[in-house]
Amino acid sequence: MKRIFLSAKLHKVTTTAVELNYEGSCEIDGVLLDAAGIGAFEQIQIYNINNGNRFTTYTILGKDNSGIISVNGAAARKVNVGDVLIIAAYALYSEEELEGYAPRLCYVNNKNILTKISTGSKKSSLY
């Protein structure tokens, strides 16, 4: 049996742009995507800390070290520039893969510059 677990999280990134008339997605600084192990065009969940909105979209590779977090298309109606977001990616894991499981947790400063990478603690008896 496979289960869905968090694979990576970008914690408290700040929205730098919203582009309503774009085909969709979320453009994210390439350094942040690499640090989290999230690929271009990978499905992500976005949780808006400011207003509680939660939605699904996919990533677009942004320029390295730009700090860009641009929410585009219809999702732009759920976010304002300056809103603080949690961006999460999930993956399917087999029981065997869960033995070595640890999500990548990436933290940034208020300019979306990476400050820390850690892994989740294993507090559950499930893995």
From Swiss-Prot:
GO cellular component: cytosol
Modified residues (Pyruvic acid (Ser)): S25
Cofactor remark from the record: Binds 1 pyruvoyl group covalently per subunit.
Principal subcellular localisation of the protein: cytoplasm
Cofactor: pyruvate
PANTHER family on file: ASPARTATE 1-DECARBOXYLASE (PTHR21012:SF0)
Annotated protein name in UniProt: Aspartate 1-decarboxylase
Pathway: Cofactor biosynthesis; (R)-pantothenate biosynthesis; beta-alanine from L-aspartate: step 1/1
Record flagged with keyword NADP: no
Signal peptide: none
Localization annotation: Cytoplasm
InterPro entries documented for this protein: Asp_de-COase-like_dom_sf, Asp_decarbox
Family: Belongs to the PanD family.
Residues noted as binding substrate in the record, renumbered to the chain: T57, G73, A74, A75
Post-translational modification: Is synthesized initially as an inactive proenzyme, which is activated by self-cleavage at a specific serine bond to produce a beta-subunit with a hydroxyl group at its C-terminus and an alpha-subunit with a pyruvoyl group at its N-terminus.
Catalytic activity: L-aspartate + H(+) = beta-alanine + CO2
Residues the record marks as active site: S25 (schiff-base intermediate with substrate), Y58 (proton donor)
Role this protein plays: Catalyzes the pyruvoyl-dependent decarboxylation of aspartate to produce beta-alanine.
Annotated GO biological process: alanine biosynthetic process; pantothenate biosynthetic process
EC number(s) from the headed UniProt entry: 4.1.1.11
MF GO annotations: aspartate 1-decarboxylase activity
Keywords in alphabetical order: Autocatalytic cleavage, Cytoplasm, Decarboxylase, Lyase, Pantothenate biosynthesis, Pyruvate, Schiff base, Zymogen
The keyword Lyase appears for this protein: yes
Known partners and oligomeric status: Heterooctamer of four alpha and four beta subunits.
